[in-house]
Amino acid sequence: MPGGEAPHSFEFVAAPTDLAPYLNSLYIWRLGDEQFDDVLPAYSGQMVVFAKGVGRMQFDDEVAETSDAFFLAPLCQARNFSVNGPAVLFGASINFRGWAALSGLSVHDYHDCFLQPGTVLEDGTAQTLSGLAQRWSAGEVDDAALLDAMCDIIRRGLSRLPEQHLTVIDKTLEWLSSSFKPELDDLYASLPYSKRQAQRLVAQFFGQSPVRLVRRYRAVRAATLLSMPQLPELIEAEIREAFYDQAHLIKEIRFFTGRTPKRLMPGAGSSINEMLGPDGYSSVNLFGSGESEQLGNDPLDDF
């Protein structure tokens, strides 16, 4: 970015306990009086209140502009975006269980796009969400109250998922967490469906086939680990072995995260890197048990 990093901050806020099964986290992003250009990684769905400023995101041949409130459907690849400051954004990062329970929309059909509140929510809650930016600007609600209001909207919008659908989501997440290169047969064996049905349901809840989903999470997982300081050599070697060669590693990480290994280094200076960490991407255990032991983490803490 010309002139160096714009003055901005990214604050994660823990989701309320009752919403923890559905959300990665809440967050507040602030930008000073400058333009900020970056790339958002292939990330889960977001509910957003753009309280100040305006942003744009590139979706293939279309540039979409933000509104006061909107949903960002789950991303299947990294996307370029630009924000004109000053800006303040409030967000709820919705994991794949939450997206299915809140929206009821197939990720195969709705991904990599902005959605108006009425596409996801019933009319009353959609109107409430759309009015939050104006209420914040008028001083009727502060930061904490706005996030609380977003949580209330999510609570009102959640529906109960069939147990078999929850099984597909949770078993797929467990499978993705098990290895850099999990075996497809292991996934199919864990699901109460035929191979063809399993592929269709994985695409419905995650937007991509199991084969492509492995590519996506392998890249995100590798990017997360490479962004950590003092990465043990054994883990770095495991990352290298998961890709054909260095060129393949760079290509995959760039496609799914918008980063290169150099830009992921500690101190590289992008708050968007924080979204690749466990606070921002907690629906999948990005650290398998072997990596967790070497990093001194309890793998259960990464969910």
Give residue ranges: language-model regions.
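Alpha-helical bundle regulatory/interaction domains
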Residues: 1-170, 176-185, 191-195, 209, ...
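A secondary-structure capping/hinge motif
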Residues: 202-208, 252-262
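Short, conserved glycine- and acidic-residue-centered signature motifs
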Residues: 215
